[in-house]
Amino acid sequence: MKTFKHISFKSLALLALATTFFALPAKAQMTDNGYANVDWQYNFPLSNAFTDRSSGWGMNFDGGYFLTDNWAIGAFLSYHTNHEYVPRRTITAGSASLTTDQQHSTFQLPFGLETRYAWNRGRAFQPYAGLRAGAQYARLSSEFNIFENEDNTWGFYVSPEVGINIFPWAYGPGLHIAAYYSYATNQGGVMQCGVDGLNNVGVRIGISF
């Protein structure tokens, strides 16, 4: 009998929690028409001969304002660093040569404007689709022995994104989850290795306001 009561109590508690979660009031975020996200970012470089290793060394910051019930405009800034170890090899330039291993790094910092279309605003689950466009600074660097060679580049940046904001409480911050693809026109290289455009896919997980 005690076991039955214990199971019943747990079942009722779970039912009450689920009912409360799915019956949240319409006002489920901290501002009526504004939005902001702070995210950790993980990316996967595509067709990048300079640094092709995935990495979690990134952050994203964005925010904006809804001009209509569903459509918003805003601004963004994010950054990411990818690394790749290059085994020892000989590099020749004319009559000179250098034999060394290298540590390649690509630092990307895009920023600009964004737009998004959101569904189910004011509820607990708010999916959206968006597009970003702007400029990107990218630093390509190679460390070898005690030296470093680098190339600083600029390019045009564009990135479609899909995501969802989840607000499990009536008021206060929520959870932001997104997936994105990005392309930038940056060109450059060091130590006879470089890039002609930067492509990435990635995910973002963070806090939504």
What are these regions (language model features)?
Residues 26-73, 206-208:
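Short glycine/proline- and aromatic-enriched beta-strand/turn motifs that initiate or cap beta-hairpins
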Residues 48-55, 85-92, 139-148, 187-195:
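Outer-membrane beta-barrel translocator domains and adjoining extracellular loop/strand segments
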Residues 1-32:
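Cleavable N-terminal export/targeting peptides
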Residues 3, 7-12, 46, 146, ...:
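Short, aromatic- and cysteine-enriched interfacial helices/patches
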Residues 33, 42-44, 62-145, 155-158, ...:
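Gram-negative (and chloroplast) outer-membrane scaffold detector with strong preference
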Residues 81-88, 158, 163-209:
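Predominantly the C-terminal beta-signal and adjacent terminal strand-loop region
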